[in-house]
Amino acid sequence: MAANRPAIFAVPAAAALLLWPALLNGYPIVFADTGTYLSQAIHLYAGWDRPVFYSLFMLPLHATVTLWPVVVAQALMTAWLLWLACRVLAPGSSGWVFVAGVAVLSVCTWLPWIVCELMPDMFTPLLVLVLCLLTFVPERLTGRERVLLVGLATFMIASQQSSVPLACVLAPVLAATGAAIGGPDRPHRHQDKRRAAKVCATGVAFHSPSWPGLA
């Protein structure tokens, strides 16, 4: 519990820093496809060209009232994943250092813009981060964190069609790289490969209902 105390402050603070484009705009940023993602869950239909899972993710958050909770949730998800990466890769870093790093990212990169956009595009870079954590440092994660990351990776793959080829190529490459770096005695090397295969297979399976529409 003590190890999680910095996150109670750091994650919400970092999430707030990532929301400045929406605050500057006066509203979450919309794109041409945003309407499709919103309408699928509201009107109960599944378009062949847009997976429904991002629509289902948004519906309980906006509840057809306001879209602000969606971008707040996206900012919190992003901040938590960045905090998790910081904690396992640089365990000596303080919460203040983490928030300062996110402040730099929020000013110098495009990250806050995709976080504030009502599109699943933010899941592409986050998927890379999640797969790297699961592959290279699974032993530094708690069992609950590994389960959450596997669930998030599956959701991210299922939410965007472009994530399918990305994950199918990246996951086995990362698993092989992790095994090669760690050598034959690296713990979890076999679990890495199985986990990558299961995540990819599940995410791809969720896409299968839309394949007939591609013909």
Which sequence ranges carry the predicted segments?
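Transmembrane signal-anchor helices characteristic of membrane glycosylation enzymes that use polyprenol
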Residues: 4-29, 106-107, 204-214
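Transmembrane and membrane-interface helices of multi-pass
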Residues: 12-20, 96-110, 115-117, 125, ...
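Extracytoplasmic catalytic/substrate-binding loops of multi-pass membrane glycan-assembly enzymes
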Residues: 24-37, 45-57, 61-65
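Aromatic- and kink-enriched transmembrane "portal" helix at the membrane-lumen/periplasm boundary
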Residues: 52, 59, 63-67, 71, ...
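Transmembrane-helix motifs of polytopic, lipid-linked glycan transferases
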Residues: 68-92, 103, 107, 126, ...
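Specific aromatic-rich, kink-prone transmembrane helix
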Residues: 84, 123-140, 145-153, 170-177
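Membrane-interface alpha helices of multi-pass inner-membrane proteins
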Residues: 146-161, 201-209
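Juxtamembrane membrane-water interface segments immediately following transmembrane helices
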Residues: 165, 184-187, 194, 198-215
